[in-house]
Amino acid sequence: MKNFLPIVKLACLAAVAALIVSCGGGADYRNLLPADSFMTMSVNPASLMEKSGACDATCNPLLDRLKAELGKAENLSAEESEYLLSLLENPAESGLDLKKDLFMFMSMSGADINNPEVRGGLLFPVGDKSKLDALIARINEKSGTEAVTENGVSVVKIGEDTAATGVCAYNDIACMLYFQTCGGDIEAKVRGLFAQKQGESLMGDKAVAEQLARKNDVNMVLSYGAILPMMNNPMLSSMPMMDALKGMTMVGSVNFEKGRIVTEAAVSYKDKESEAKMMDFYAYVKPQTGALLRYVPAASIGAMSLGLNGEKLYSMLSAMPGYGMLMANPMVK
């Protein structure tokens, strides 16, 4: 009996651990998204292919055209052509999980907005690592590159002789194509993204995480705080609303439905102070009640109503660089 109790305890602990993992405690490929991205977009390929009718390989004009072009390729062996054809007909053979969202992200930095340092890439979820290993091995053999694996993350350097250096990095959870135009150790940067925790990534932003959890054809995230440092302009930086913009993030979605495209957008703030600053800046805009709609012709396809508080509008413009002297003119007052 004494020997039986420890076994029961271990079984209970194992059951609890399995339950925790099954409830979402496992690794999330989205945790690789850089927190400094000013623009991030997700696309659900499975949903778009289903809605476009592209899932049926037997009657897909694009697939037929790609097959025809593949047949013209002279530098491919019969076996290579057959393999590529299988990928076209069933993209899941690549090892990527195309039932989940794929992501595109971009960051910018530097003092010159006309010549910024750009970083960005694509992030894919991995469904079958053995198939992805086979695909990468074929590419390496064909291109003369090789994968360097450390701590479970394999990295292949690409485009080293071009203006933008890049890498393909992957493990059993995610595959990332990452490029940058600036100098620095790009491999170390990418390995850092694979090692970061949720709180260090873009998913650490609650509003962003909630948006990306929604089942949409396309999700978009635009972080004003990540792009404002690029605007190295004294007039822009001195505008009253700049402090509020630093804590502002816009999230939105696009869904393709029969006969229409549905879009939604919302703005979130990192704290109540940033939200209060923005609300104070736009205090010159009067809320609309819809009372003016009675004067709009019934056949109109659209209408816009805008109300302004003249005194608050004057105060706002007076605080704007370049407008202060104009607003101080007695004739303007």
Regions found by a protein language model. Give the residues of each.
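Charged, amphipathic alpha-helical scaffolding segments
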Residues: N31, T165-K189, N255-Y282
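Sec-dependent bacterial lipoprotein signal peptides
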Residues: M1-V21
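Structural boundary/hinge residues at secondary-structure and domain interfaces
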Residues: C23-V155, L202-G247, I261-K333
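Short, flexible helical or helix-coil boundary motifs
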Residues: C12-A15, S143, K197
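A conserved glycine-rich beta-strand in the N-terminal activation segment of trypsin-fold
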Residues: V155-M231
